[in-house]
């Protein structure tokens, strides 16, 4: 994999760590707030799909069933945020193409990694939540 793709993948993993850790912390405080992770899917308008025409063409062929657009992904996110599903959302991962919560990667559920990232983020930003 290219360095750019690895960085992108790690950034998505860190997003999941953040959501799962935030969910745990909010539950522990009894805040009553819910947080969820949402994957908008591969979108035709993103730089990933438009930067390189040959890469975009291959991606469209390989992932045609997963391709969407901003409007479809936005509607799926709005439905989730508005609570239009008949299920709880807190601490879960949702994919635009799925009718319910999905499992994220096994690594994304590593609570130690999530906690370490949270603490490092607090240290680097000077912001504690």
Name each region found by the language model:
Residues 1-129:
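NAD(P)H-dependent oxidoreductase Rossmann-fold/reductase module
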